[in-house]
């Protein structure tokens, strides 16, 4: 019996796959537990439509990420921070991914999720710093930060 998997089933198939499985296994286990449904011509058409819509959505997300990357990679896109600095040359407050995200929104109108900004630890130094941003699994940009003494 041909079935369309609605969820990943270890050793049998992944979500969205169409596979031939034993009839008893399909009826008594997969279909009963909503892990799969029978592959009729109508359900196959629905699946193809969903896959096309998903691909289109992924393409839009990728295009949006590339547009944001183009803005961030421009030389004039430099996020300005003014921080108080102690005698040892370190800032009193640290610059976190959240702060960087908020300043990008405020200064350039570019919305970047703070979870996409790759910081090993908060920035406490002054000067010019480049921070990588993972906008999409295929798109990575660099944010230029100019941290000056207040």
From Swiss-Prot:
Signal peptide (residue range): none
Keyword Ribosomal protein: yes
Alphabetized InterPro entries for the sequence: Ribosomal_bL9, Ribosomal_bL9/RNase_H1_N, Ribosomal_bL9_bac/chp, Ribosomal_bL9_C, Ribosomal_bL9_C_sf, Ribosomal_bL9_N, Ribosomal_bL9_N_sf
Biological role stated in the UniProt entry: Binds to the 23S rRNA.
GO cellular component: ribonucleoprotein complex; ribosome
Domain of life: Bacteria
Family stated for the protein in its record: Belongs to the bacterial ribosomal protein bL9 family.
Key words of the record: Ribonucleoprotein, Ribosomal protein, RNA-binding, rRNA-binding
UniProt GO molecular function: rRNA binding; structural constituent of ribosome
SUPFAM superfamilies according to UniProt: L9 N-domain-like, Ribosomal protein L9 C-domain
Classification lineage: Bacteria, Bacillati, Bacillota, Bacilli, Lactobacillales
Protein name per Swiss-Prot or TrEMBL: Large ribosomal subunit protein bL9
One BP term from GO: translation
PROSITE patterns assigned to the protein according to its UniProt record, in alphabetical order: RIBOSOMAL_L9
């Amino acid at each position: 019996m041909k079935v369309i998997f609605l969820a990943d089933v270890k050793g049998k198939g992944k979500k969205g796959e169409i596979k031939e499985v034993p009839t008893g296994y399909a009826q008594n286990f997969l279909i009963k537990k909503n892990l799969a449904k029978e592959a009729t011509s109508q359900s196959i058409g629905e699946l193809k439509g969903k896959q096309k819509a998903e691909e289109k959505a992924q393409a839009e997300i990728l295009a949006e990420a590339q547009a944001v990357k183009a803005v961030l990679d421009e030389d004039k896109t430099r996020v300005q921070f003014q921080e108080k600095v102690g005698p040892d040359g370190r800032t009193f407050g640290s610059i976190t991914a959240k702060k960087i995200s908020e300043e990008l929104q405020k200064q350039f109108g570019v919305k970047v999720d703070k979870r996409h900004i790759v910081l090993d630890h908060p920035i406490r130094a002054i000067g010019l710093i480049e921070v990588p941003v993972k906008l999409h699994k295929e798109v990575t940009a660099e944010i230029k930060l100019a941290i000056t003494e207040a």
